Design a protein with these regions (language model features):
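Surface-exposed, charge/polar-rich loops and edge strands
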Residues: 1-9, 13-16, 20-27, 111, ...
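N-terminal active-site beta-alpha-beta segment that forms phosphate/nucleotide-binding
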Residues: 2-120
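Short glycine-rich anion-binding loops that position phosphate/pyrophosphate groups of nucleotides
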Residues: 58-61, 130-134
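Charged helix-capping and loop-helix junction motifs
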Residues: 70, 139-145
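A short beta-strand-loop-alpha-helix capping motif that often carries His-Thr
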Residues: 88, 122-129, 142
Length: 192
């Protein structure tokens, strides 16, 4: 049974709290956590079959998926990262060392010179987040970019973050899209 909405935390307050907790992790600890998450991901039976990954370029204290995508690219997996165009995410081919642009708020994205990758062709989305609920609810930054994307595609939605980003449930809205799994230094959790 879901708790009454009166007992659920406010999304804005929860975003602030989870960002502060994530920011409190030292760069060395974040790096160690990412390396441990990579070990867990390598054990996932679907990992070796992934052909195209939709990833992201990390911002500030976000989980840095570069180690995950590097190991995938070494075995021939294509990596794409999003550019924001007209309030929508459009994925572009990306390799370490490619040119990037800095957007509003310091967020990095591939340049428009890189090849477009259709979102429908992506079979695994490594998804940034502030929080992940116990049932796969994703707490993002409030822009709805990933909710709009996930309403249109069928690829596996894997939230990537740190264990401290697992949160108590909050009130979700009709447009909120759930994750299929969550990866952290503690392991891989799949949601039904």
């Amino acid at each position: 049974m879901k708790p009454s909405t009166d007992a659920l935390p406010d999304k804005r307050a929860l975003r602030r709290q989870l960002r502060a907790e994530r920011d409190s992790l030292s760069p060395a600890l974040r790096h160690a956590h990412v390396q441990q998450a990579n070990v867990h991901l390598a054990r996932w039976e679907r990992w070796s079959a992934v052909k195209v990954i939709g990833s992201y370029l990390p911002h500030e204290s976000e989980f840095d998926p570069t180690a995950l995508t590097r190991s995938a690219r070494e075995r021939g997996t294509r990596i794409a990262c999003p550019r924001v165009i007209d309030k929508a995410l459009h994925f572009h081919d990306w390799q370490e060392g490619d040119a990037v642009e800095v957007t509003i708020g310091g967020v990095l994205q591939p340049t428009n010179a890189s090849e477009i990758v259709r979102a429908e062709d992506i079979d695994l989305f490594l998804t940034p987040l502030l929080g992940c609920g116990q049932d796969g609810a994703r707490l993002g930054y409030g822009g709805g970019f990933y909710d709009r994307l996930f309403a249109e595609v069928t690829g596996f939605r894997l939230g990537v973050g740190f264990a401290l980003q697992r949160a108590a449930d909050w009130e979700t809205e009709a447009h909120d899209q759930r994750l299929h799994g969550f990866l952290s230094e503690e392991g891989l959790t799949l949601f039904s």
